[in-house]
Amino acid sequence: METTVRKQKKNLETKKTSIYSLQLHEMQDWLKEQGEPKFRAGQIFDWLYKKRVKNYEDMSNLSKGLREKLSNSFDITTLNTLVKQTSSDGTIKFLFQLYDGYSIETVLMRHEYGNSICVTTQVGCRIGCTFCASTLGGLKRNLEAGEIVAQVVEVQRALDESEERVSSLVVMGIGEPFDNYDNLMGFLRIINHEKGLHIGARHMTVSTSGIIPKIYKFAEEDLQINFAISLHAPNSELRSKLMPINRAYKLPDLMEAIKYYVNRTGRRITFEYGLFGGENDQVEHAEELAALLKGVKCHVNLIPVNYVPERDYVRTPREQIFLFEKTLKDRGVNVTIRREQGHDIDAACGQLRAKERKEETR
């Protein structure tokens, strides 16, 4: 009987490109190289994203020869569900195992307007935010575009049982999306495409801790995707304490990049502001935040801190949260308090992590 370690070694040695990593035009190019008509790409995408098959044998309108070529060239990435937890509020957290034994977490959130999925872009994270569980083990590796796509496909398969669909997504899971920029953009284009899962660009949100060069690059992209910044502090000194990345990408420079993005795209930006008891949640912090954001087309999302055992932060009292919100509103800032989801299964903001570690290969 094969051990887990041996299976992982075998997977690493035989791994092929994920077919989920290919955009439609890339599939068409590959088909042309194989002497196949490009319209087959649409048929293949239909099998992958509409029928959501798990093997090539099921693609019955393709020739046996083409199915064999596909099988020899690409894997249909499947994620092994290690754990599936359901919260009292209906939120579902999936712990998925990857081909090399690493694991990631993906969250399905229920809203009145539909089902939203929170996807992961990296195994671990290098950013080192002092309040977040995702960064505790450091960064292991980037996910391929196909591995990010596969998260959405797997969750959609789970929803197929109740004839529901994923209607929106947020890229706010484990990892810094802009540290995996090319795979992130490939994923977004595949998911957005009408031949893919066809989730509208305006129903997708990407969040970053503030990788400034990539913010400028993102401003030039042709997808009208919602954009969020993990801010969490109204000044550089406090932000550097909470988010070490601020030492590399200073707050004044970050604000310049944000203003460029807003002016270039005409789109409103969202600032995520976690409230940490006694750290960044006082009236003076709210006043300073309002001054920082003055003149910026934006929305502030206040996030009460979620419990992480290895971190020392405590939740801001409810009355203080409302006072912080009121202080911002009184100064003309568009602000809401995020509805908490999945807290009881560690699926809320800042709580995601890979709880199953990769076994050492020998």
UniProtKB/Swiss-Prot annotation:
Q: Which CDD domains does this UniProt record tie to the protein?
A: Radical_SAM (cd01335)
Q: Name one GO cellular component term.
A: cytoplasm
Task: Please name the catalytic residues of this protein.
Answer: 105 (proton acceptor), 349 (s-methylcysteine intermediate)
Asked whether the keyword DNA repair is assigned, the reply is no
> Can you quote the record's cofactor note?
Binds 1 [4Fe-4S] cluster. The cluster is coordinated with 3 cysteines and an exchangeable S-adenosyl-L-methionine.
Reactions accelerated catalytically: adenosine(2503) in 23S rRNA + 2 reduced [2Fe-2S]-[ferredoxin] + 2 S-adenosyl-L-methionine = 2-methyladenosine(2503) in 23S rRNA + 5'-deoxyadenosine + L-methionine + 2 oxidized [2Fe-2S]-[ferredoxin] + S-adenosyl-L-homocysteine; adenosine(37) in tRNA + 2 reduced [2Fe-2S]-[ferredoxin] + 2 S-adenosyl-L-methionine = 2-methyladenosine(37) in tRNA + 5'-deoxyadenosine + L-methionine + 2 oxidized [2Fe-2S]-[ferredoxin] + S-adenosyl-L-homocysteine
What cofactor does its activity depend on?
[4Fe-4S] cluster
Q: Which GO terms describe its biological process?
A: rRNA base methylation; tRNA methylation
Please give the function described in this protein's UniProt entry.
Specifically methylates position 2 of adenine 2503 in 23S rRNA and position 2 of adenine 37 in tRNAs.
Q: What else is known?
A: Reaction proceeds by a ping-pong mechanism involving intermediate methylation of a conserved cysteine residue.
Cite the HAMAP family for this sequence.
RNA_methyltr_RlmN
Spell out the family assignment given in the record's similarity comment: Belongs to the radical SAM superfamily. RlmN family.
Q: What is this protein called?
A: Probable dual-specificity RNA methyltransferase RlmN
Supply the source organism for this entry.
Bacillus thuringiensis subsp. konkukian (strain 97-27)
Gene assigned in the entry: rlmN
